[in-house]
Amino acid sequence: MKPADFAQSMERALRREDGPATAGANDLSFANAWQRVEEAAAKRIAAVDAGEGSDPDGFEGAYVRRVLELAPAGSCLFAANSMSVRAVDTFYLKGAKQLIVLANRGLNGIDGTVSTAIGASRCFGRTTLITGDLTMLHDLNSLALQRELRVQRQLADIAGDANRTPEQAAKRNTCETDTGAQGITIVLLNNNGGAIFDMLPQKSQEAYFERLFLTPQDVDFQAAVAAFGVPYSKTATLAEFDRAYRASLDVPGISFIEVPVPLQGLRERYADYW
């Protein structure tokens, strides 16, 4: 339809003389069709949470669903940019549990994500950051805040709530929610590169696509995280992830869970959900 034809159709609809438009049989049929499609999509997403599918242990969406299921109600979920925020948007179904969902887009998109999430954990209490490896690398030095968090906790234990001024107590009550030990769990969905670019048409250019677009980094995150004294675990299955994530919820400060996922084939893995 040409823009002019569309505008004329809208004008005729607005000038109708038979009163307000009411939903006819065709309108209801169209709405019902959309509702059926939405319900079918919700069932497919719920099946991911149940570990169904051809390879749930290698699918980013399955781990995002587990975080959404296991995160304490009222806690903060921080979604990094690129595929992380898209996965949260895709797999976060409407439900009874309420989460504080945050995101931050830096000047270059992914810069400052980790430090922002750590800052959010100081205000909202228990926080989970879902991030990819390139975003993590861009702000890796934020893990140095582990020492500062440890010092602050030690000072708080020494001072005790009894020695706080009324203003300090009010601020503490405002910025800390009752969601377990204050801290942040970083869930690294490590596809060793920029898997989001796997959806580009340039994918067919095998001679340069991986080197210039996917940019695999081959970083040893266990060694990198250890340099900052951050507790680390690596999981290869949903069952292992469940155990590691549940355990991290009782750890103050920063804890780190690495989940290896495939670099290529992202378009195919998400085909049933987009």
PLM features per residue range, with description:
Residues 2-9, 26, 33, 59-67, ...:
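General structural feature for long, well-ordered alpha-helical segments within catalytic domains
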Residues 10-21, 38-45, 49, 68-71, ...:
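Structural signal for hydrophobic packing residues in well-ordered secondary-structure cores
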